[in-house]
């Protein structure tokens, strides 16, 4: 299965599998305040998923694979949303840069992401290798089961 890249895999399946890999590897340090963090000021509550930090890290890695280099400001735009103001009109609002910064710092500590000299961050060869390896596993499972890619989750 050489030649299979992240671009050819369903993003939801890849993100779930990468998050499971990051959690299983134990290299990602989840900050203590992650339990109380909201992912943006447009959100009303903190995430209900206990593993949301791993999912966010996996999503950031996928984004860096496709569009690198990117900084914290770019990710606040990517994860932005609509702030509901009650009876007043809704407005566009950027996401929290604190949780993005913590995720990038955790990925840097795990040697998956590094700083780019022109600004922002990019994937390391190890991070790119991990993403490609997981994409190949997903395709192998798909061919083995002959199931659609969206139905496959490897752990």
Curated annotation (Swiss-Prot):
KW Ribosomal protein (keyword) present: yes
Q: Which SMART domains match?
A: Ribosomal_S19e
Membership in a protein family: Belongs to the eukaryotic ribosomal protein eS19 family.
- Which cysteine pairs make disulfide bonds? none
- Gene3D superfamilies (UniProt xref): Winged helix-like DNA-binding domain superfamily/Winged helix DNA-binding domain
Query: Mind telling me which GO cellular component terms the entry cites?
Result: cytosolic small ribosomal subunit
What's the source species for this entry? Drosophila melanogaster (Fruit fly)
Please name one Pfam family that this protein belongs to.
Answer: Ribosomal_S19e
What's a single GO MF annotation on this record?
A: structural constituent of ribosome
Q: Which UniProt keywords apply?
A: Ribonucleoprotein, Ribosomal protein
The alphabetized list of GO BP terms reads: cytoplasmic translation; ribosomal small subunit assembly
Q: What is the lineage of its organism?
A: Eukaryota, Metazoa, Ecdysozoa, Arthropoda, Hexapoda
- What is the protein named? Small ribosomal subunit protein eS19B
Recorded superkingdom = Eukaryota
